């Protein structure tokens, strides 16, 4: 997690250093199409549907006019868990640049079979976790962006192939810069919370450049 004071410091740096905060889906579409992004382009993402995103993060983003993406796990939302966002709160955030994408229903370890579970049953459960969120987002918010953040950053070749076949862009939790040659079934992101919340180290990440490998 990141404190409100730290998050404010991060957002102030983006503003004062003239970073261009872009909607994630649009930035990715432009990167894949080979369209040049603005100088110092960045996108802001959150994982999980915790309510403090609305209560503490959203006012800071709204004040600065920054778009953002929240990868939500819909299970706690549908259950009315008071620690998680409501659909009404998400609709409000949508009006001010918020975008909500797939983080599965129950935030499972995607590569872990449950006790006594067959491989076939595991695969049915995992694909249902992903597809059910797409349906919920479309029903509740009018759209389901074709983006999925893997819980705990975990995926494998089979899951990545499934995601790609559905036209979904996948995100892990490894660090790195996104560019046209990136693996869009397992894109990197830079963390900015917990041990990674210090502004000094965040500045280094924000100014990183891709280093493509050429055969």
Language model segments and positions:
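Acidic, His- and aromatic-enriched active-site or binding-groove loops in soluble protein domains
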Residues: 46, 167-176
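Short, electropositive alpha-helical surface patch
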Residues: 154-171
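A cross-kingdom marker for long, charged
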Residues: 155, 175-208
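Conserved beta-strand termini and adjacent loop/short-helix elements that scaffold enzyme active sites
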Residues: 24-27, 71-73, 103, 173, ...
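Metal-dependent polysaccharide deacetylase catalytic core of the NodB/CE4 family, i.e.
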Residues: 1, 17, 32, 37-42, ...
């Amino acid at each position: 997690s990141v404190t409100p004071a730290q998050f404010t410091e991060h957002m102030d740096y983006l503003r004062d250093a003239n970073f261009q905060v872009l909607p994630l889906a649009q930035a990715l579409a432009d990167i894949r199409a080979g369209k040049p992004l603005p100088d110092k382009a960045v996108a802001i993402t959150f994982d999980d549907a915790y309510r403090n995103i609305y209560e503490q993060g959203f006012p800071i983003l709204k004040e600065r006019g920054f778009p953002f993406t929240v990868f939500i796990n819909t299970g706690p939302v549908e259950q009315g868990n008071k620690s998680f966002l409501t659909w009404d709160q998400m609709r409000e955030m949508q009006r001010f640049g918020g975008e909500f994408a797939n983080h599965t229903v129950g935030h499972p370890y995607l590569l872990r079979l449950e006790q006594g579970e067959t491989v076939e049953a595991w695969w049915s459960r995992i694909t249902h976790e992903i597809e059910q969120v797409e349906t919920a987002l479309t029903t509740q918010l009018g759209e389901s962006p074709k983006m999925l953040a893997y819980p705990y950053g975990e995926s494998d070749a089979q899951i990545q192939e499934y995601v790609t076949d559905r036209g979904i862009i996948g995100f892990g939790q490894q660090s790195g810069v996104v560019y046209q040659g990136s693996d869009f079934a397992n894109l990197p992101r830079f963390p900015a919370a917990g041990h990674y919340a210090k502004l000094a180290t965040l500045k280094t990440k924000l100014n990183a450049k891709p280093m493509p490998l050429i055969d």
